[in-house]
């Protein structure tokens, strides 16, 4: 963060900085650490020695550019070279070579990785920090148990606990525990040293069990190790001490449960007042003794328990840590490979070279597996530029070593006071992962040890100057931090006023002289997505969460538009996302076209390539449009071209729409939205989408697959777009079912003869039928569009097989339609229910028809009043051609601070445009609308204004689905669910009620039984529908009923059932 010493102001750091810093730390430190830990490798006779010199590693320039890696579906990586030395002691030969370790994926300028042509992101993980923690919990009898938990750097745990009988144990698993003297003796201490170093020896002896100080196994370390091994592994009988037993104990217990690491070493040193060097990464007897002492203090009320949800007890595992772990894993595999190669060379009595010893396969495959399958390596969400920024700044409790969505408690998911200024209290996932996937606050950063830090202005007592200081979680609790209306106070009267402040996780009101730090600005506590919501303070937090999440689902529009009412952060979000092209150097523009901008800088020519109609990971269109002119002089950092969702370098996700909050014939019931046809015909909400369809040709057991235009048994109309090579031609308009790539797959000849036409041709004419079947790539349902690109990629990775991949890109232009979803920034969302002709829409007194009609009941119950505050200045700004940038929480200056500027702006717009209806004193903020159908004025004035409404990626073209026949579940014999499985629509309880309300008994019976899960009847029903005959009546029960009977029989009752027809109910009255 940069500090302007003259004005005391600061600039917001780059939003992707957290990823760049992590990768740079891995390149500068993590690589060297792991390479220096790579051991010298010798053969069994110690005649050959191999060694790597990791501090002199080199990264070569990438062989291909990032854009070419995306185009050819390759990985954007660099070759890693390390100097190596091989010594043969018999012949005294020394060979030195620079060997290739493998390909290391590189981070691009957007903070992501391109792996196999796909952009991926590595998410930061929140883990419990290694160290010693104290807690208490009641046992089954209600007695409080005090526990000290030692968490290792590997995630293993061991506990010291004082049970209900006031005895102290070391618990190594849920069912096994050992006494403290055995553990300490096995670690090298005797009873005398233990009692000398314990602060409370009498209490310590009273907590031991069965006078253990008199036991035989405490007199020697060997006996203690044997006793510890028996207790740990439940071994009975006599054991013989050996080095292998010690080695196994060291590997299974000490390394997994006692290795604290450099970060974990600081925790016991601070908590237990120890002075142990940080390079001592294992737990020592001193640690255990100090932990026992502190447990005794906690037992008698002299110590404090730890809050495990506090951020000071957690650390961030960044991209640097994850990549370093994978690199260390790859080097371990490389070490085994080198040992095998040396062993093989020794048997053959030949001297290998360093290049022969080292192979690049372990490193390359390890990173490919990591980026392809690791839970924290995720598919980059590229719906819009904001989505990419937020994805780079995510924090996850999930993943290896973390929590799971099913086991995490509500306490962990909840907001903690230590999150203040570090983790956004609003933005999180919805559903099972609520509270487990959070977002980094806008000014937070990750410290050197993985701690989250937040900046504050330090207030000096001697001078009026303020200095910016980053405080870690836990450090700010000991200072009084002003959080309230300090900005609204004049310097002369600050000392006389009481200021809201934060101290020890509580909010207090204290004098200004007692303040140590102050917050920087109101955005400090929120994430990027939440900071883009105007009038945030007038919203319910749940609706703000929905608004921030739905901004990330907005699709870039054909004609993006800047918001009239914003927060001022839009200008930084667009450049930091990487969607806009930025000038790297100042100069004069000499050439511009759709794909390139060239500038002259001190006689040199600098070219900037633009992105034109490229597909994102979410099938949206990425495109850059130049916004500079030829001959114009640009400065360094100036915007050269806008992205798909930016205008003038500002983030632009939606459109400023004239909305009216009123009911209209029930079409906006329950959040449904009524829109004007103007939004359709004038392409207001038109978006571009690019779908990719791929097909692979490979070698089969019958021969290679072929891409060709000559496809037998297919109509020529389906093949009309193919060229001579069997690929679809660029610019072709394709419909559902058209062939994009013609492919033939060989099959055995006897399979061809099984077909009736094959046997007929061979019997009559003696013609041998083709021994290949067509397996073409076709346009799926809903995939119609224009072909804009065809990529034929050759791969030689599958064990020497020359596999070929063809990708076809189809461009779609989607107008808004009934069923699409739109939403505002304040959590107001809805589905388009009807598109009205513009002449039927309500219109203003100047004849302007309303674009969108929203339900007014959606404001009161949801408590998102911010949308009313947004639309009124939006109307004034639209009439006066102004834009407003409003900082949230402006009511810290005075009461009703958000409301007071609204009416003056409306009055100014009314005066400037000579339209008195804009501001009517009798009902300010509301207008008299006229019904477009009748021409009559509506009875009540209506709140009307300009709201910023994005169109979301949840579109009806992607979701609509119909099933005529498809797969069934094996157990219930009912149709599967989901569009991807060609499933059916579930007729649930509420749907049954709706049909019952219309009295359609026969339709209900068919839907619930015959057409659903009756195996025999559904085939008969299909035939009856085709022929127009009556629906048959089956003589057996449906499968789900039979399943229910079987489940009930498992409880041992005898159940049977019979089918009763209508004729059986014709019973004579006398019999009754």
UniProtKB/Swiss-Prot annotation:
Top-level EC class as recorded in UniProt: transferase
Cysteine disulfide links: none
GO terms (BP aspect): DNA-templated transcription
Metal-binding as UniProt keyword: no
Catalytic activity: RNA(n) + a ribonucleoside 5'-triphosphate = RNA(n+1) + diphosphate
Compartments it resides in: Plastid, Chloroplast
UniProt keywords, alphabetically: Chloroplast, DNA-directed RNA polymerase, Nucleotidyltransferase, Plastid, Transcription, Transferase
Pfam families per record: RNA_pol_Rpb2_1, RNA_pol_Rpb2_2, RNA_pol_Rpb2_3, RNA_pol_Rpb2_6, RNA_pol_Rpb2_7
Cellular-component GO terms for this entry: chloroplast; DNA-directed RNA polymerase complex; mitochondrion
Signal peptide: none
Sample GO molecular function, one term: ribonucleoside binding
EC number(s) from the headed UniProt entry: 2.7.7.6
Domain of life: Eukaryota
Keyword Transcription: yes
Family stated for the protein in its record: Belongs to the RNA polymerase beta chain family.
Record function comment: DNA-dependent RNA polymerase catalyzes the transcription of DNA into RNA using the four ribonucleoside triphosphates as substrates.
Oligomeric and partner information: In plastids the minimal PEP RNA polymerase catalytic core is composed of four subunits: alpha, beta, beta', and beta''. When a (nuclear-encoded) sigma factor is associated with the core the holoenzyme is formed, which can initiate transcription.
Protein name, per record: DNA-directed RNA polymerase subunit beta
Species whose genome carries this gene: Cycas taitungensis
């Amino acid at each position: 963060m940069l500090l302007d010493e003259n004005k005391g102001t600061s600039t917001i750091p780059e939003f992707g900085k957290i990823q760049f810093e992590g990768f740079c730390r891995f390149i500068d430190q993590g690589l060297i650490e792991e390479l220096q830990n790579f051991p010298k490798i010798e053969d069994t006779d110690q005649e050959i020695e191999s060694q790597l010199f990791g501090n002199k590693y080199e990264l070569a320039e990438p062989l291909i550019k990032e854009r070419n890696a995306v185009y050819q579906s390759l990985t954007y990586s660099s070759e890693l070279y390390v100097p190596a030395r091989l010594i043969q002691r018999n012949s005294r030969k020394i060979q030195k070579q620079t060997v290739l370790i493998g390909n290391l994926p590189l981070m691009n300028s957007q903070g992501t990785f391109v792996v196999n042509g796909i952009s991926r992101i590595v998410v930061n993980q929140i883990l419990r920090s290694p160290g010693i923690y104290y807690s208490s919990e009641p046992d089954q009898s209600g007695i409080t148990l005090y526990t000290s938990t030692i968490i290792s750097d590997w995630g293993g745990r061991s506990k010291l606990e004082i049970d209900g009988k006031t005895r102290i144990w070391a618990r190594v698993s849920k069912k096994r525990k050992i006494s403290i003297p055995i553990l300490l003796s096995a670690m090298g201490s005797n009873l005398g040293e233990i009692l000398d170093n314990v602060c409370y020896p009498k209490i310590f002896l009273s907590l031991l069990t069965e006078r253990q100080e008199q036991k035989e196994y405490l007199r020697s370390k060997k006996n203690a190790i044997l006793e510890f091994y028996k207790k740990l592994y439940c071994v009975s009988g006599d054991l013989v001490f050996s080095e292998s037993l010690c080695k196994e104990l060291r590997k299974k217990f000490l390394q997994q449960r006692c290795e604290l690491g450099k970060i974990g070493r600081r925790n016991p040193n601070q908590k237990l007042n120890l002075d142990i060097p940080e390079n001592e990464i294992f737990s020592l007897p001193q640690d255990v003794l100090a932990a026992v002492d502190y447990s005794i203090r906690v037992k008698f009320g002299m110590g404090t328990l730890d809050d495990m949800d506090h951020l000071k007890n957690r650390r961030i595992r960044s991209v640097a840590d994850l990549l370093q772990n994978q690199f260390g894993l790859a080097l371990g595999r490389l070490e085994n490979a080198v040992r095998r190669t040396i062993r093989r060379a020794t048997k053959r009595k030949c001297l290998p070279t360093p290049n022969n010893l080292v192979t690049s396969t372990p490193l390359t495959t390890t990173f490919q597996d990591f980026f392809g399958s690791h839970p924290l390596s995720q598919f980059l969400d590229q719906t819009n530029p904001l989505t990419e920024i937020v994805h780079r700044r995510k924090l996850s409790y999930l993943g290896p070593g973390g929590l799971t969505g099913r086991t995490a408690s509500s306490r962990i998911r909840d907001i903690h006071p230590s999150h203040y200024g570090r983790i956004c209290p609003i933005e999180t996932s919805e559903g099972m992962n609520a509270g487990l996937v959070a977002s980094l606050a806008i000014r937070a950063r990750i410290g050197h040890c993985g701690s989250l830090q937040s900046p504050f202005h330090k207030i000096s007592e001697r001078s009026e100057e303020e200095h910016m200081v980053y405080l870690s979680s836990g450090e700010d609790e000991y200072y009084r931090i002003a959080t309230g209306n300090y900005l609204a106070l004049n310097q002369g009267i600050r000392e006389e006023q009481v200021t809201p402040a934060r101290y020890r996780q509580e909010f207090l009101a204290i004098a200004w002289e007692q303040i140590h730090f102050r917050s920087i600005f109101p955005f400090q506590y929120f994430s990027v997505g939440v900071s883009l919501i105007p009038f945030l303070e007038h919203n319910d937090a749940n609706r703000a969460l929905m608004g921030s999440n739905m901004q990330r689902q907005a699709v870039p529009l054909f004609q993006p538009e800047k918001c009239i009412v914003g927060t001022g952060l839009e200008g930084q979000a667009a450049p930091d996302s990487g969607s806009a092209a930025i000038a790297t150097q100042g100069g004069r523009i000499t050439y511009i076209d759709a794909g390139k901008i060239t500038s002259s800088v001190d006689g040199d020519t600098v070219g900037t390539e633009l992105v034109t109609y490229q597909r994102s990971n979410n099938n949206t269109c990425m495109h850059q449009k130049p916004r500079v002119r030829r001959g114009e002089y640009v400065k360094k950092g100036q915007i050269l071209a806008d992205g798909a969702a930016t205008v003038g370098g500002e983030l632009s996700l939606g459109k400023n729409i004239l909305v009216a909050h009123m009911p209209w014939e029930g079409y906006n019931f329950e959040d449904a939205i009524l829109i004007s046809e103007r939004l359709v015909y004038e392409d207001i909400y038109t978006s571009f989408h690019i779908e990719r369809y791929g097909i692979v040709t490979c070698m089969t057991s019958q021969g290679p697959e072929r891409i060709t235009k000559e496809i037998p048994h297919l109509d020529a109309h389906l093949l009309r777009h193919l060229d001579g090579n069997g690929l679809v031609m660029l610019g072709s308009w394709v419909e559902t079912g058209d062939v994009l790539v013609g492919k033939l797959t060989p099959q055995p000849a006897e399979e061809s003869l099984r077909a009736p036409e094959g046997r007929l041709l061979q019997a009559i004419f003696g013609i041998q039928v083709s021994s290949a079947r067509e397996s073409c790539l076709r346009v799926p349902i809903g995939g119609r569009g224009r072909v804009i690109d065809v990529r034929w990629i050759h791969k030689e990775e599958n064990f020497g097989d020359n596999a070929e991949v063809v990708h076809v890109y189809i461009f779609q232009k989607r107008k808004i339609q009934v069923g699409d979803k739109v939403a505002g920034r304040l959590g107001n969302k809805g589905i388009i229910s009807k598109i009205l002709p513009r002449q039927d829409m309500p219109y203003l007194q100047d004849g302007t028809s309303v674009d969108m009609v929203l339900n007014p009941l959606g404001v009161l119950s949801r408590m998102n009043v911010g949308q009313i505050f947004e639309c009124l200045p939006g109307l004034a700004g639209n009439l006066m051609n102004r834009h407003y940038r409003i900082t949230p929480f402006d009511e810290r200056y005075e009461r009703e601070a958000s409301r007071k500027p609204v009416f003056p702006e409306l009055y100014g717009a009314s005066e400037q445009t000579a339209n008195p209806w804009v501001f009517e004193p009798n009902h300010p903020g509301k207008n008299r609308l006229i019904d477009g159908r009748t021409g009559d004025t509506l009875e009540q004035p209506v709140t009307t204004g300009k709201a910023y409404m994005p169109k979301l990626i949840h579109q009806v073209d992607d979701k609509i689905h119909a099933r005529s026949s498809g797969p069934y579940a094996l157990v219930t014999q009912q149709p599967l669910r989901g569009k991807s499985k060609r499933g059916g629509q579930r007729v649930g309880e509420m749907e049954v009620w709706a049909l019952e309300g219309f009295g359609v008994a026969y339709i209900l019976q068919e839907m619930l039984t015959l057409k659903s899960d009756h195996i025999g009847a559904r085939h008969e029903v299909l035939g009856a529908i085709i022929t127009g005959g009556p629906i048959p009546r089956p003589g057996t029960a449906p499968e789900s009923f039979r399943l229910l009977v079987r489940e009930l029989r498992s409880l041992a009752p005898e159940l049977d059932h019979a089918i009763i027809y209508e004729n059986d109910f014709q019973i004579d009255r006398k019999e009754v």
